[in-house]
Amino acid sequence: MVRQLVWQRATASRRLAPKCLSPQQLFARRGLATEASAARMPPYPKIVRNLEQVRKVLGSSRALTLAEKILYAHLDNAEESLLTGTNNGKDIRGKANLKLKPDRVAMQDASAQMALLQFMSCGLPSTAVPASIHCDHMIVGERGADTDLPASIEGNREVFDFLESAAKRYGIEFWPPGAGIIHQSVLENYAAPGLMMLGTDSHTPNAGGLGAIAIGVGGADAVDALVDAPWELKAPRILGVRLEGRLSGWASPKDIILHLAGKLTVRGGTGYVIEYHGPGVETLSCTGMATCCNMGAEVGATTSVFPFSPSMVPYLQATHRGHVAQAAAEIAASGPKNLLRADDGAEYDQLITIDLSTLEPHVNGPFTPDLSVRLSDFANTVRENKWPETLGAGLIGSCTNSSYEDMTRAEDLVKQASAAGLKPKADFFITPGSEQIRATLDRDQTLASFSEAGGTVLANACGPCIGQWKRTDGVAKGEDNAIFTSYNRNFPGRNDGNRRTMNFLASPEIVTALAYSGSTTFNPMTDTLKTPSGEEFKFRPPQGSDLPSAGFADGNPALQPSAGVPDASVEVIVSPTSERLALLEPFAPFPEGELSGLKVLYKVKGQCTTDTISAAGPWLKYKGHLPNISANTLIGAVNAATGETNVAYDDAGNKHSIPDLAARWKADGIEWLVVAEDNYGEGSAREHAALQPRYLGGRIIVAKSFARIHETNLKKQGVVPLTFADKADYDRIDACDQVDTVGLYETLQSGGQGSIQLQVTKKSGEKLTIPVNHTLSKDQCGFILAGSALNLLAKRAHQ
């Protein structure tokens, strides 16, 4: 049995210490969670009433998609949001500014720090909506859970203490280190059909597998919900994905989204909700649907959602939420226009049809999640591109693929190989998604199968997927190497800090099979392996179970969440000498006039993700300390002029790191901007990618296009995101050019009405005028004028 370290609740002295429990304690009944589940029912009567009001505003004959129903039923004022600037409600998608009231908020430990620091400055006694904190991002994967978890707890004690004390004070449920990955825990405990929630992580849409509208946001957006302020979203367009047929053989739900990512690309879903429908939906498990929704983030989608389906009822029942299942089933049976399915005749802005019966496994990568290749073509692709043919490691798990179904299908392959006397030729790592999953896999001997085969079972946490991987296989920085993972993201350097590690994304089944071959060119559907006795061995297609026949094991009671009851007597302390946490100083408001004398700090070439702008991995420890983490700003960005990474030049031609030059200019009172290409800020929801440039003196980012979450985060922190009216103008502006704005101040003052230009002065003295576009709403103009959304909230609170 894999023994899990358990979080010891903070004592009066506020000390946090790990301890091990006996097997008897490990499987104790989880009374707290079972009782708490009764309070996790979505406010269905209110949501249904709100939808009825929406029908009155838009007309009862208006056919709505599922996503529209759930979103519009959570509007603060349906008439205001749906009829303002929309041709009396005829042109809502892409035009209306929806002001929404989410049902709940979830935060992971890395992003929760800044979200809580912002929330604390508002001076409220508790959160306005139910909220939870999940400690999953700051746990390193190296040798296994028993070793890694205590070391990570000790190394992050100050941060975990801060998060737990803040949770206790403000009535937030606190899931301690080792309890599981945020999205798996949300699926098991909080997600429900028809729910709308925000999460401070880009893969929050995972909850769409249970019919929820769940949207990834930055911490400042989460604060809106926590203080009961309406949260604003540009009304998304709807991309319908019709599923037909049934998966078979080696194909899995992961292959649906890997295939879709190849069709849409990393920005093809921007501004859309992906809404799955069709007869194929009823053939998928709840956790399989969650996998599809999880990776909607990789195509830029606002979120993804599935309609209520037969698999949701047994999943809710198995996770102690039979009362939610019953209520949702009653709504689903209430008529053809019910909350939990699209209306007949609902129209989609785009429609893609996928035949599950003909879908085969896909492999996506390297370096981008949309480079999709069918498994049957992958070996040739490897050879044509001269990618490494030796597989260094196979890693399964993560929030995308750590369900009971995922793990038992992988176990089936392990058992087949073990019976033939085979062992993995590549390092093999397994990450359970939650304590409930881990305990169940332990009880059912699945973890024993992995361990006996030579696999390493990591803690119930993000680990290598978020860059918390301490590799011990001797791969040097800068050395080309290949890994296969069942993760969701594969940007350069993301997993191990080595930008030459090629991470190929696949299903857990394909990753497991390739780990046994040790080769990136192996195709388990057709190829064979040699057994120790010299015989040919071929894998059979994997089999698994959606849900455990004996029910889920309860797991360790010490890894259940604290009760969400506020306690004003709890003191939340942030030491002024801390290297990990720092209280926030308000940003200065926008000047009374145009911005002038800005300088171009950097012109970015190619892909610029949030990992590029604010790296994770070892930098996660500074997430609560803005001055310290700002030292990693844009360190992954490629210089458009020289091709160098993290190399910037000042006016005199002197060489600096990007954050060093930004800090020097800040000290000299020089404000700056960044010039970038398409989909700037793709990837995670981390608001540090907006906070850090703002802290260092950044005022504007001008790009060919933006990723949705990052564009919003910039506005929230007072940074102005602008796009080139003509993308060719990217080539006309260079590092160290001087820039003045024309029309920006007037646009901000008028609530977003007006046109903006950049007046560029080249080093030669030549002057250029570059027209730019914006997406600023009236409220967002208020954020920027005030200096940040938090400044505006504080100002309103004191009025």
Swiss-Prot record:
Function: Has no detectable activity towards cis-acontiate or cis-homoaconitate.
Naturally occurring in which organism (per UniProt): Aspergillus fumigatus (strain ATCC MYA-4609 / CBS 101355 / FGSC A1100 / Af293) (Neosartorya fumigata)
Further comment found in the protein's record: The fermenting yeast S.cerevisiae has 2 aconitases, ACO1 essential for the citric acid cycle, and ACO2 specifically and exclusively contributing to lysine biosynthesis. In contrast, in respiring filamentous fungi the ACO2 homologs (acoB) seem enzymatically inactive and the ACO1 homolog (acoA) is solely responsible for these functions.
Entry protein name: Putative aconitate hydratase, mitochondrial
Segments of this protein annotated with the region Disordered: 538-564
Expression triggers: Constitutively expressed on glucose medium and on ethanol.
UniProt-annotated binding residues for [4Fe-4S] cluster: 399, 462, 465
Subcellular location as annotated: Mitochondrion
Gene name of this polypeptide: acoB
Binding site for substrate: 108, 201-203, 489, 494, 685-686
GO MF annotations, alphabetized: 4 iron, 4 sulfur cluster binding; aconitate hydratase activity; metal ion binding
EC numbers: 4.2.1.-
Gene Ontology biological process terms from the UniProt entry: tricarboxylic acid cycle
